Amino acid sequence: MKRYFLVLCLLLLLPVLCSCGEEEVRTIKIYNCVDYIDEAVLDDFVDYFYEKHGERIDYIYDTFETNESMYNTIRTGKTDYDLCCPSDYMIQKMIREDRVEKFDFEQYNLDTYFENCSPYLLDLFEQNGWTEYAACYMWGTLGLIYNPSELASKVDEEDYTVESWEDFLKPEFKGMASLKDSVRDAYCVASIMVHKDELSKVDSSSKEYNTLIQDVINRVSDEDIEKVSNKLREIKSNIYGLEVDSAKGDIVTGKIAMNLAWSGDAVYSIDLAEEAGIELRYTVPNEGGNVWFDGWVMPKGADKELAQEFINFLSLPEIAAQNMEEIGYTSSIAGDAIYNLIDEWYGVASNELYVEECQALYDEDPTIENKELLDEAIAYLDEATYTEVDLTYFFKGTLSEEYLTGDKVIVTIDDSYMGRQFTTQYPDLDTLNRCGVMQDFDEQNETVLQMWINVKANKASVILIVSLISFVTLAILLVLYSKRSYFARKRRLNKK
């Protein structure tokens, strides 16, 4: 009996004894927007951390659809994420509400991030007081993607270049454009249109203009909201409709010819259209627009060592390039690998690489068709024209000497990508000067949101809702009247 009791005790103690020999594995918990990372880098980070620190770690990776859903999850306090990736305005809101940790620059560091992040973006963060709380991940602009030939056909021109937000209101383009179903993006555009006369009095290349556009897109007094509301109703009456994500394909199929777009989505559509032989372009209109960014922040209680090390890992130029190739958006990271990627996508190297691919195809299968393809590639390489673009503002201090032209960073870009993919991803300083960062609307958030709800509700919807309410009310009154009549009759019968 004692022997059986001893065996039972040993069996019960076995898991405890085994666990004593196991290392406790730390886990980094990451909360990111959907489709916003090459998930292969998560496994790579585990290996990177082990090689650097000799410690095995694990990860949990969750995604969210919107900034608001992310915020609500963090606000409950029931989660313990080490990193999340909100957009600029949400970062500001979370900092203001004390929902994020400051980076620890003493015990840990963000050296790799600071070494490789674009100086333009580092300066932007410093100016706005975000450096201690957030690390820039992806960035871009808000502008218009359009089909020049479709628009040109409506104004009897051979070509058409969109230069103003006012094109949303052109009678010739009625029913040809779509607007994002996004209150902040729509507000930005309408506010610029409302204040176009004020903006036109200032030189768009001046520092004063940058200050003014920043102010204009963030004006949310009751009077400003009313003016923006009226302008949005005017826009809505002339466009095809509102969209969340469908316009990326609709502009390729010809359902629309112009759309309010984030630069990353615009590149996707331009690439997709190119495969179908359709030319699309992207522009930030002359009046200006919005420069946006998404960044990593640490919610309260985060493991700062794991979080900051992950940011450093993502800031390695080769990892940033891998991410860009996967998701299509523009990384905040500069460095040699990003320069090479730009050249491979849009520069002389892109055409040389295409010739090499055609040559390899012909060598493997020497058909007439493949020979014609090779000849066309060689002819294009010989005839292609290029523009030298100064990207010093983005790359300064992040490149090896071999990439420098004196003290400048010059990239040679195939002209077919100018006004299209390349300038969509890397706008020049003149464009950025007429772009502002949108702020959190703070106490006016609910007012602006209600305004947008009202704008989206068309007259037919309002009439339908009012009619439905009236019908339900009438039905309830009839039921109550019927019941009252029934009981009245019953009382009369009982008296008899």
What kind of region is each of these model predictions?
Residues 454-472:
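Juxtamembrane/start-of-transmembrane alpha-helix segments at the extracytoplasmic/lumenal side
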Residues 294-426, 492:
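Mature extracytoplasmic/periplasmic domains
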Residues 237-301, 343, 350:
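Extracytoplasmic/periplasmic substrate-binding proteins
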Residues 472-486:
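Alpha-helical transmembrane segments
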Residues 32-40, 87, 95-255, 269:
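Extracytoplasmic ligand-binding site segments that recognize negatively charged/polar headgroups
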Residues 16-19:
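C-terminal motif of bacterial Sec signal peptides marking the signal peptidase cleavage site
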Residues 487-496:
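Cytoplasmic C-terminal tails of single-pass
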Residues 23-97, 113, 460-464:
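Early extracytoplasmic/lumenal segment of secretory-pathway proteins
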